[in-house]
Amino acid sequence: VLEENGKLWNAAACLCEDGSRHYYRKSHLTEREAQWAEAGDCAGLVLDRPYGRTGVLLGNEIFITEVPRLLANRGCDILAVPAVENPSCPPGIPEVQQEVEHYHLARVRANENSTYAAFAAQKGVSGIFGPDMFLVPRNEVVLNESGFADMTMDTRFIFSDESGCPVINLVREKPMLGTRHTTWYDK
């Protein structure tokens, strides 16, 4: 909770290596949050860090397709998603008989937007999901209990594959963005 000028916000604090602090004020509030919190800016928080451009969304905003999409359109390589109550499935949608991570929304959003998703749940599955769901083995770290997830995320524009050939990084190329009709959600 962030308090400014007598107003309360559901917020995430981002502390950077240089000591600076940045706050993301959640813009898509639940009914319960709307009883005490102000809605934040829909533009979201985007930070240019040495490891890649990072976009922050909070809690249930992972359920809203457009929020991660707008961050990806702003060039984010990584989606940072702290504090979701139930990450596997939005309310009202039945769970499926798959491994619990298979349809995990952080995994789906990372794939839809060609980004990484670093995801912390209050309960359930947390982890870091890579941009390609079809890569085997998957480029991800999944935690089903308390712990620390650590993974190398390659956000370079071009790198070499096993044969030494240059490859454009999926996270930077963002091929999925080229198929979108942005007139529906551009301001």
What is each model feature region?
Residues 28-30, 60, 84-86:
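Active-site-proximal loop/turn and secondary-structure-junction residues that shape catalytic pockets
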Residues 1-56, 111-148:
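Catalytic-core segment of enzymes that process non-peptidic bonds
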Residues 118-187:
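C-terminal beta-strand edge segments of enzyme domains
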Residues 33-36, 66-68, 172-173:
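A short, polar/proline- and glycine-enriched secondary-structure boundary/capping micro-motif
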Residues 48, 74, 186:
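RNA-binding accessory domains that recognize and position tRNA/RNA substrates
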Residues 63-148:
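CN hydrolase (nitrilase-like) catalytic-core segments centered on the catalytic cysteine
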Residues 14-16, 42, 76, 89, ...:
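Generic recognition of cysteine residues
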Residues 56-62:
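Active-site mouth loops of central-metabolism enzymes
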